[in-house]
């Protein structure tokens, strides 16, 4: 049974390993999942996600562990985004962990920065008091010694050890900076109940961290739990790095009494907590992966029986005129009414998908959007971007140069608009069905204000140029980029590893949905990986007629095409079998 660790710290707060090193260690230990929960900071999540994504893509999709509802060890270590918020409850310090927050949200990050500013003010006052005790220390010295870190008392102790003011880090706490010591300055903190509400506002799953510390401090843990539960607390760390079996049983009893889901972790800090090991703590802690699955089910409103349907738009759900038939809507309503999830999966950019959704009035409960062939995933209910991979400016510049050398028109995008090198028949053709504004600019890499998920090339008169372009991209970039033919006149370039099939695997794991409960439908080359990854891959008849080779990657072919409700008829038949 794979185990997990949902409480760790990196160099972005007071740990000694970088976010990527944490993920690497978790992978070497065989952990199925790792949560990065730095103090009042999500600055390390992007780096950790990049490392976890690399291992995810290297792992074999056919690993049988992927058939369990627990995070699949066959897909590498899953990175759970998180944060640990320092709070105050009746004059005492209490920590609240938030799992799965909307960490990309600028307002969320700005709020955390304000919390850090209060920490900086406290640290400057502590430096002043330490200088009064003969310790030559300035806040700027700490920042230089620990670049990129959120400075905590642990950093004070390490700095004093390096400079010879103490012989052990614990001596710094005992003599100078521990609670009630002469150089300790309490920090103005958000209240514990407000922190829970704050985390909920940004779609996190709030968990009370290391509750046994508050229990042993002799103030009323039950009163704390009652207040936090009323504010919306959803979990509690039954598992913790220093817990005894008695501690585990005590906190588990409280979890049951207050309707809180178990969570937990080692609170690993690297060398800053000697003897404490990731995944096991100080002893033999082992957190079953099912703990995370239960959290996902509660957080994302899924379950072991939930099914998920990834559906292409153009040529699959949409008719030739880009409309969706009343019967297709009826069947999709039936699908979501049964508690299953629907994913609008397209090669289009996210802004364009949202335009299509509004145009069609297609608002389904629990619907998710997968854009740019799986490079970006968006949760419609929460408004949270769950996943996003982008090209960098150097890649954009090189791709445009290759397109120019072949004589191809190319365009790219930001979150709200397209960028094209010139206007002409290609723009007229492309934007006939895409209702997104565009800017004209020669250098696409310099023009984009936000990094794009893809670059699009168009050839209206000589499709052979697309094949040449595709070959040149492969020679120049190898596995660094993926290239898809999404239309007879289009080729799209996305980051390496990105595909609709990868998005299916990633989203099943994030939502806690069994891979064997997945379905996918499509009609084109860029849908093939999705059809192969799904337990049931549905190829449209029109796709099979245009690209017969796609039939080898599908489990079934619809009897009718996209203009004859081919998809809706097939999905209705599947629902009939599920209901039988």
Which ranges hold each PLM region?
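Substrate-recognition/cap helix-loop segment adjacent to the acidic, metal-dependent catalytic center
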Residues: 219-232, 349-368, 464-482
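Catalytic core of soluble alpha/beta enzymes
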Residues: 266-299
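Extreme N-terminal starter segment of soluble prokaryotic enzymes
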Residues: 1-4, 305-310
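An N-terminally biased module of ancient metal coordination in phosphate/nucleic-acid-related enzymes
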Residues: 1-92, 177-178, 190-198, 202-257, ...
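Conserved acidic, metal-coordinating active-site core of Asp-based
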Residues: 148-211, 402-521, 525-528, 533
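Mg2+-dependent phosphoryl-transfer enzymes with acidic/Ser/Thr/Gly-rich catalytic loops
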Residues: 302-308, 325, 492-580
């Amino acid at each position: 049974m794979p185990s997990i660790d949902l409480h760790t710290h990196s160099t972005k707060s007071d740990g000694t390993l970088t976010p990527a090193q944490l993920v690497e260690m978790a992978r070497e230990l065989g952990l199925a999942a790792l949560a990065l929960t730095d103090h009042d900071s999500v600055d390390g999540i992007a780096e950790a996600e990049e490392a976890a994504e690399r291992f995810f893509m290297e792992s074999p999709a056919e690993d049988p562990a992927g058939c369990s509802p627990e995070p699949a060890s066959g897909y590498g270590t899953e990175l759970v985004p998180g944060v640990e918020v320092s709070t105050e409850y009746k004059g005492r310090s209490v920590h609240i962990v938030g799992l799965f927050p909307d960490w990309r949200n600028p307002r969320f990050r700005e709020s955390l920065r304000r919390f850090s500013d209060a920490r900086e003010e406290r640290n400057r006052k502590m430096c002043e008091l330490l200088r009064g005790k003969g310790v030559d220390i300035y806040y700027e010295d700490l920042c230089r010694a620990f670049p990129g870190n959120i400075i905590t008392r642990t950093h004070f102790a390490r700095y004093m050890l390096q400079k010879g003011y103490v012989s052990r880090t614990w001596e710094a706490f005992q003599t100078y900076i521990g609670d009630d010591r002469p150089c300790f300055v309490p920090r103005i903190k958000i209240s514990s109940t407000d922190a829970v509400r704050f985390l909920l506002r940004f779609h996190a799953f709030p968990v009370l961290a290391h509750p046994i510390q508050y229990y042993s401090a002799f103030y009323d843990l039950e009163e704390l739990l009652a207040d936090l539960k009323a504010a919306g607390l959803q979990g509690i760390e039954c598992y913790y790095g220093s817990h005894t079996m008695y501690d585990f049983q005590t906190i588990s009893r409280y979890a049951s009494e207050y309707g809180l889901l178990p969570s937990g972790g080692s609170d690993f800090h690297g060398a800053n907590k000697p003897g404490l090991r990731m995944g096991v703590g100080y002893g033999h802690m082992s957190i079953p992966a099912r703990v995370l699955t239960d959290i996902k089910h509660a957080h994302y409103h899924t379950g072991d029986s939930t099914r998920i349907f990834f559906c292409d738009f153009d040529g699959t759900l949409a008719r030739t005129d880009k409309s969706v038939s009343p019967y297709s809507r009826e069947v999709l309503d039936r699908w979501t009414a049964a508690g299953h999830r629907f994913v609008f999966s397209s090669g289009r950019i996210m802004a364009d998908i949202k335009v299509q959704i509004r145009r069609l009035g297609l608002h389904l409960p629990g619907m998710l959007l997968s854009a740019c062939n799986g490079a970006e995933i968006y949760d419609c209910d929460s408004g949270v971007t769950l996943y996003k991979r982008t090209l960098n400016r150097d890649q954009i510049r090189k791709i445009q140069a290759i397109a120019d050398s072949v004589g191809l028109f190319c365009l790219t995008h930001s979150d709200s608009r397209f960028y094209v090198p010139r206007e002409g028949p290609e723009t007229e053709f492309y934007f006939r069905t895409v209702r997104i504004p565009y800017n004209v600019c020669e250098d696409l890499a310099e023009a984009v204000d936000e990094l794009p998920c893809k670059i699009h090339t168009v050839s209206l008169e000589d499709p052979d140029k697309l094949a040449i372009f595709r070959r040149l991209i492969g020679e120049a970039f190898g596995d660094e980029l993926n290239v898809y033919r999404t239309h007879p006149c289009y080729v799209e370039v996305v980051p390496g590893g990105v595909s609709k099939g990868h998005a299916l695997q990633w989203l099943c794991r994030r939502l806690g949905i069994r891979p064997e409960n997945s379905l996918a439908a499509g009609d084109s080359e860029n849908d093939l990986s999705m059809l192969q990854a799904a337990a049931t891959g549905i190829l449209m008849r029109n796709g099979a007629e245009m690209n017969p080779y796609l039939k080898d990657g599908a489990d079934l072919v619809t009897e009718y095409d996209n203009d004859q409700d081919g998809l809706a008829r097939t999905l209705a038949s599947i629902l009939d079998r599920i209901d039988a």
